């Protein structure tokens, strides 16, 4: 078996950043995270096997990278046992597509050898599933990990992709060439270090979750302009919008511009099934209050008609709490209109 271990001195998020985001998702959490990625000889959990595990955890207050690579298929069980023991010191497992592939695959291999699952009682944070809502906002061509890395400006991958690594690993088994082994290990290293880099993209989700403070509000006669401060720095600037609104962000600041109609704004609401739309008044009313309205004058609200009107008054422009409440209701709808 090939075993590697080394400290990570740069290119990985600091402890406080990881603690902030993992704590945001999991309240009962002791801050013992581990990032991991696996390499297998195929997708089938029954006919292929695990040959490499890479992980990053905290040791002596330092991010440390670990790898275990099988030099033959008989070493799979040994790697599984070592990884299981390794995971005992961690309670939050961070992966990319781990809940759909890595973890189910590993659980099947543990079962094959009659070994208990090391995932019992562990918290899982799958960055693929968690970051998926950002695809449209950040104009990502796909949700593959290298696509996210490229958005962040990381274009220095030098090793082969996962599919090509399978053939490289098979070549290594035949030739015992450690140059080939290093290529396989290098690909896994890039994948695991990439997890740390795209982890910071969780900051964009603060926009969706209303985790910001309004720092500026202005109405120029046609548009409402709001500026927001996030609790973290964005790893890369972005901009997006359509005919209704425009959103741009850099570092901790996000700027929001939305068109008004006659100095009024549409405030959208979730759960349109709970509202009636009144076409003559161009607004909605809760069903609990609208049951007495003639059916000729009401319709079932849709996500596009589930709104009331908001006046850009001086009182509104001088009240950050009202502005945030407006955004909390309206921004999720507007983000959903992006294509």
Where are these regions (language model features)?
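Short beta-strand scaffold segments in enzyme catalytic cores
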Residues: 53-55
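DEDD superfamily 3′-5′ metal-dependent exonuclease/proofreading module
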Residues: 1-36, 41-48, 58-339
């Amino acid at each position: 078996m090939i075993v590697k271990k080394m400290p990570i001195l740069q290119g990985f998020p600091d402890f406080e950043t990881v603690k902030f985001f993992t704590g945001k998702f999991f309240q009962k959490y002791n801050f013992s995270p581990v990032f991991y990625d696996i390499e297998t000889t195929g997708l089938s959990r029954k006919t292929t096997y695990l040959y490499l595990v890479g992980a990053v955890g905290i040791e002596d207050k330092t991010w440390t990278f670990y790898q275990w690579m099988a030099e033959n298929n008989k070493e799979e069980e040994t790697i599984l046992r070592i990884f299981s023991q390794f995971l005992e010191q961690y309670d939050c497992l961070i992966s990319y597509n781990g809940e759909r592939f890595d973890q189910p695959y590993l659980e099947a291999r543990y079962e094959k050898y009659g070994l208990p699952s090391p995932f019992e009682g562990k918290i899982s944070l799958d960055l693929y599933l968690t970051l998926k809502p950002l695809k449209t906002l950040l104009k990502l061509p796909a949700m593959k990990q290298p696509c996210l890395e490229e958005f962040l400006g990381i274009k220095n991958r030098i090793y082969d992709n996962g599919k090509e690594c399978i053939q490289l690993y098979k070549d290594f088994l035949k030739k015992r060439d450690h140059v080939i082994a290093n290529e396989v290990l290098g690909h896994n290293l890039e994948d695991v270090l990439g997890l740390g880099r795209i982890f910071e993209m969780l900051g964009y989700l603060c926009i969706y979750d209303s985790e910001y403070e309004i720092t500026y509000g202005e109405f120029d006669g046609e548009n409402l302009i709001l500026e927001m401060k996030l609790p973290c720095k964005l790893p890369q600037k972005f901009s997006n919008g359509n005919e209704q609104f425009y959103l741009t962000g850099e570092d901790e600041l996000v700027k929001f511009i939305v068109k008004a109609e006659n100095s009024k704004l549409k405030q959208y609401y979730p759960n349109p099934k709970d509202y009636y739309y009144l076409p003559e008044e161009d607004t909605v009313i809760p069903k609990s209050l609208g049951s007495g309205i003639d059916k000729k004058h009401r319709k079932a609200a849709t996500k596009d008609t589930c709104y009331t009107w908001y006046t850009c008054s001086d009182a509104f422009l001088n009240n950050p709490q009202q502005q945030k409440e407006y955004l909390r209701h309206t921004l999720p709808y507007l983000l959903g209109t992006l294509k």
